[in-house]
């Protein structure tokens, strides 16, 4: 049985996300796969590439043929050079910077302060009408007691 390592398309329209899969060469692009060995999300900045290197090396060693796009991805990760016995790639993969949650929270709070109009803040979560009614009731009670 001829086995290929190929990309299985997932995601939405104009937002492709791919799974790197091992499948029979005769199977459809998005058909049944033997094994899923990685992910590729080209629309993210930088592109997300996750590959299970151990499984890739196994499938290449038993004769699985990568398609051209997968071969390019494997060259970027260094798995193709490892299989062929070539030197590792000189250009390292770009890694996304971790998101600073404190900075995001501060920016979010700043936007919230801009959206809330001065003098319209409701403390206690009651609306103006509800506050007026409660004030009238307390005034009536105090008059009735006196």
Curated annotation (Swiss-Prot):
Keywords: Ribonucleoprotein, Ribosomal protein. Gene3D superfamilies: 3.30.1320.10. Residues 128-146 have a biased composition (Basic and acidic residues). InterPro entries: Ribosomal_bS16 (IPR000307), Ribosomal_bS16_CS (IPR020592), Ribosomal_bS16_dom_sf (IPR023803). The keyword Ribonucleoprotein applies. It comes from the Bacteria. Coiled coil: none annotated. GO terms for molecular function: structural constituent of ribosome. One of its GO terms (cellular component) is cytoplasm. The keyword Lyase does not apply. Residues 119-146 are annotated as: Disordered. GO terms for biological process: translation. Pfam families: Ribosomal_S16 (PF00886). Belongs to the bacterial ribosomal protein bS16 family. This is Small ribosomal subunit protein bS16. It comes from Thermobifida fusca (strain YX). The lineage of its organism: Bacteria, Bacillati, Actinomycetota, Actinomycetes, Streptosporangiales. The gene is rpsP.
């Amino acid at each position: 049985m001829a086995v290929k390592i190929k990309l299985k398309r997932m995601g939405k329209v104009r937002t492709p996300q791919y799974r790197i899969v091992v499948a029979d060469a005769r199977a459809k692009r998005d058909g049944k796969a033997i094994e899923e060995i990685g992910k590729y999300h080209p629309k993210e900045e930088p592109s997300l590439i996750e590959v299970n290197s151990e499984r890739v090396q196994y499938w290449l060693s038993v004769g699985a043929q990568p398609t051209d796009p997968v071969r390019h991805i494997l060259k970027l990760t260094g798995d193709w050079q490892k299989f062929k016995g070539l030197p590792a790639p000189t250009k390292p993969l770009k890694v996304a910077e971790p998101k600073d949650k404190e900075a995001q929270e501060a920016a979010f709070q700043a936007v919230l302060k801009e959206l809330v109009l001065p003098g319209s803040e409701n403390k206690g979560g009651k609306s103006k009408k509800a506050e007026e009614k409660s004030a009238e009731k307390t005034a009536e009670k105090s008059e009735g007691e006196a």
